[in-house]
């Protein structure tokens, strides 16, 4: 360093004036961190030695500020070089502070270090290029922030509490016996306490564990009080403050302290807990019903059950505890029943909850609360009060005393009936009966519908309200105004005028339309200038068919006339006619039909009117087919019923066959006879034989002549015939009038045991006819010459002989 000083021509001492040129700037200071180099700092120009930190003497030196051309101090950076050259800078860079050197005594930003001597090392510090231009201000934290910086943890008291907390937690979790004191050092045991199962609760181990738990809770509470940032364990429960307030039941046995504290449905107790934040419960003898003790067997033993009746107040803070205790203490002081406002409020609240409160009743005359109707001050006044009825809208009486409150439903029924009347519908029979029953006065007609009465007359509708029941005035109708119902939906007023203008002068014609949609409602009104015109229009247009609708025309306002139930329709002639009695054999007899109304009852022995189903064609005249004698040809598809014992029965309706679909259908109207020649030429021969045409299309329901007591009229005699009757259905056993047998009966059924009478000789042409079928009307025949009973007995004897 001395060589550097000697070789530097620009170095000057402090006693010399500073140079004016730029080349007189002081060189950079040497590394002041090394104390060995402090004595060689001669470039400051100080000749007075000063003691070094190591004890060596050094010259006192002053730092000369670096001045620029304008006189402002200049700071050189690492790259800045002045006229002194780079030797000093190279020397200063070689000597850097080690990381193990002690820290400097002053900051590089200390202004005193720049202006004079360095108190720590006596050297000037070089400013780094990364140093801040302005020094940072030191922040002084308040005292309460020290708790959050972690410095509070080093408090001896907190450390002692933490160590004790860890020790207690270790003892509780180890499972080792907590009370291991010898026999002589133990304290006397308290009185044993047993649970509901007879097991002792307060054992030595249990008491030791409870003692450690209480101590642990207290330590945690103290740590939280000293260090609010302390996080307690998860199982920590803050201890609650509690206070017992005994109820003076012995001093005041008849006073209801519990009711005043709990209140109606517990509302008073809940209100005090909500206002104070404390918990208020009643404990002791008598606080729990006797039946509840059996339900609490599994619960923890509560030593307060054997204490006197008291109120237990629990709170987390002392303020909440004192507030709740003050409220309860006021209720524990007995007060006279007359002056007990608290009890009166509880009773009012209970009545409100039960819905039986009566303090808010209003007077029915004036509507004001506070007095009854009999004590109303405006009882004798005649003015109308401000009360408005919600039913009739009238003042002077409340809604509950409305005289027409019971007629709301009847009014709706009347409106509905008016609506039906406008639509042209009929009135239900029940409404007519009801109006007849509720007739008012002796002169009122019970047949009028409800809308025909004067419903707006309040006196007649309610004669029991002080009014004299009088006959309601009859409603006057405008005979010239007509109601027209069931109009087409597209009919307008002009169309209505054109429809009814032919009956006279029309004063007004209107089709009623919907106000919202603008469409026709289906009815309207026409007003004529004269009553005669209106009556003519009613007679002509009522029931008139117009565009697929039947118009209903009547006087407006009047109910439609009652419609009588329609009678049974007159019987119409069937599609196939019945020939008269003088037509050829095989046809049906003629029937007489009434043109209208009710028909007369049929003759008891005659058959009922057959159904209107198609019947079989009439048989061809005799001689068309000649069956071979001796050949058995039963009817096609015919089924015979089993023979009934000794009783003549009619065939069931389902035993007949329909005619073949290939047969042509032919109908004869009543009164028209079938021509045998025409029938012969029009009917083709049948391939199934002559018996096929003998079956009707659908059997009608038959009558049983044996059920009637009347005797049928006598029949005219019939000539004998030599025609073969083996294929004739007239010989069937269920025939009512069988024909007389002929000599050839080889293929007939007349000898069947169930035949009641021997057959009679039919007329010519009955061999293939249906005239002898029992459900067909029989032509008049003469009674047989021989006795039918003797013939029946002979046939029965033949049958019995064959059976043997």
Curated annotation (Swiss-Prot):
- The region annotated as signal peptide is none
Q: Does tRNA-binding appear among the keywords?
A: no
What terms describe the molecular function in GO for this protein? RNA binding; zinc ion binding
Residue ranges of the KH domain? Answer: 256-328
Family matches, as CDD domains:
KH-I_BBP
User: Where does the record place Polar residues bias?
Assistant: 1-15, 34-57, 678-693, 724-749
Summarizing the function annotation, the protein's role is: Necessary for the splicing of pre-mRNA. Required during development and for abscisic acid (ABA) responses.
Name listed for the protein in its UniProt record: Splicing factor-like protein 1
């Amino acid at each position: 360093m001395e060589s550097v000083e000697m070789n530097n021509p620009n170095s000057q001492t402090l006693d010399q004036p500073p140079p004016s040129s730029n080349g007189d700037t002081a060189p950079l200071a040497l590394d002041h961190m090394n104390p060995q180099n402090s004595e060689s700092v001669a470039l400051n120009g100080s000749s007075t030695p000063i003691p070094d930190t190591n004890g060596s003497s050094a010259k006192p030196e002053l730092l000369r500020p670096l001045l620029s051309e304008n006189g402002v101090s200049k700071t050189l950076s690492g790259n800045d070089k002045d006229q002194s050259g780079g030797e000093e800078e190279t020397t200063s860079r070689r000597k850097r502070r080690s990381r193990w050197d002690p820290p400097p005594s002053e900051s590089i930003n200390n202004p005193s270090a720049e202006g004079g001597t360095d108190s720590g090392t006596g050297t000037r510090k070089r400013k780094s290029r990364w140093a801040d231009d302005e020094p940072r201000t030191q922040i002084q934290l308040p005292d309460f922030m020290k708790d959050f910086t972690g410095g509070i943890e080093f408090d001896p008291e907190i450390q002692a509490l933490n160590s004790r907390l860890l020790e207690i937690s270790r003892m509780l979790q180890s499972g080792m016996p907590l009370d291991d004191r010898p026999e002589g050092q133990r304290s006397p045991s308290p009185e044993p306490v047993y649970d509901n199962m007879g097991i002792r609760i307060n054992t030595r181990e249990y008491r030791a564990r409870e003692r450690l738990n209480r101590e642990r809770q207290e330590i945690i509470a103290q740590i939280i009080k000293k260090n609010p940032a302390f996080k307690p364990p998860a199982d920590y429960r803050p201890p609650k403050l509690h206070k017992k307030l005994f109820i003076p039941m012995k001093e005041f046995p008849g006073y209801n302290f519990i009711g005043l504290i709990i209140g109606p449905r517990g509302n008073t107790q809940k209100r005090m807990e909500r206002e104070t934040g404390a918990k208020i419960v009643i404990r002791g003898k008598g606080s729990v019903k006797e039946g509840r003790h059996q339900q609490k067997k599994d619960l923890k033993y509560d030593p307060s059950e054997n204490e006197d009746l008291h109120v237990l107040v629990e709170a987390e803070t002392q303020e909440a505890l004192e507030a709740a205790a003050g409220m309860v203490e006021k209720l524990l002081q007995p007060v006279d029943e007359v002056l007990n406002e608290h009890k009166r409020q509880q009773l009012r609240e209970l009545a409100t909850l039960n819905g039986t409160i009566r303090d808010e009743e209003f007077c029915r005359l004036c509507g004001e609360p506070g007095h009854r109707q009999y004590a109303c001050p405006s009882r004798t006044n005649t003015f109308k009060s401000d009360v408005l009825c919600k039913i009739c809208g009238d003042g002077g009486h409340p809604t509950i005393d409305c005289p027409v409150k019971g007629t709301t439903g009847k009014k709706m029924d009347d409106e509905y009936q008016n609506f039906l009347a406008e639509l042209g519908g009929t009135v239900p029979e029940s409404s007519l009966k009801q109006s007849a029953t509720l007739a008012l006065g002796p002169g009122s007609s019970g047949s009028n519908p409800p809308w025909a009465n004067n419903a707006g007359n309040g006196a007649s509708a309610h004669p029991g309200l002080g009014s004299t029941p009088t006959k309601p005035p009859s409603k006057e109708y405008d005979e010239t105004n007509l109601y027209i119902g069931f109009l087409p939906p597209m009919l307008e007023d002009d169309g209505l005028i054109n429809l009814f203008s032919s009956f006279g002068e029309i004063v007004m014609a209107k089709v009623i339309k919907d106000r919202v949609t603008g469409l026709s409602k289906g009815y309207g009104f026409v007003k004529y200038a004269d009553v005669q015109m209106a009556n003519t229009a009613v007679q002509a247009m009522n029931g008139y068919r117009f565009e697929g609708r039947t118009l209903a025309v009547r006087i407006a306002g009047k109910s439609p006339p009652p419609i009588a139930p329609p009678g049974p329709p007159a019987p119409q002639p069937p599609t196939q006619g019945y020939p008269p009695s003088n037509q050829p054999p095989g046809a049906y007899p003629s029937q007489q039909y009434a043109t209208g109304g009710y028909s007369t009852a049929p003759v008891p022995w005659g058959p009922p009117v057959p159904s209107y189903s198609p019947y079989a064609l009439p048989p061809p005249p005799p001689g068309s087919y000649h069956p071979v004698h001796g050949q058995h040809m039963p009817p096609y598809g015919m089924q015979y019923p089993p023979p009934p014992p000794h009783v003549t029965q009619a065939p069931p309706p389902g035993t007949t066959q329909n005619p073949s679909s290939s047969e042509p259908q032919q109908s004869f109207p009543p009164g028209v006879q079938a021509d045998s020649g025409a029938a012969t030429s029009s009917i083709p021969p049948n391939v199934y034989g002559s018996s096929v045409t003998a079956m009707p299309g659908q059997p009608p329901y038959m009558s049983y002549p044996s059920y009637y007591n009347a005797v049928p009229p006598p029949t005219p005699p019939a000539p004998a015939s030599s025609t073969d009757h083996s294929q004739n259905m007239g010989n069937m056993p269920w025939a009512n009038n069988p024909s007389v047998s002929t000599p050839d009966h080889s293929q007939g059924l007349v000898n069947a045991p169930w035949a009641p009478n021997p057959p009679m000789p039919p007329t010519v042409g009955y061999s293939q006819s249906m005239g002898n079928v029992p459900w067909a009307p029989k032509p008049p025949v003469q009674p047989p010459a021989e006795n039918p009973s003797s013939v029946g007995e002979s046939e029965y004897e033949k049958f019995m002989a064959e059976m043997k």
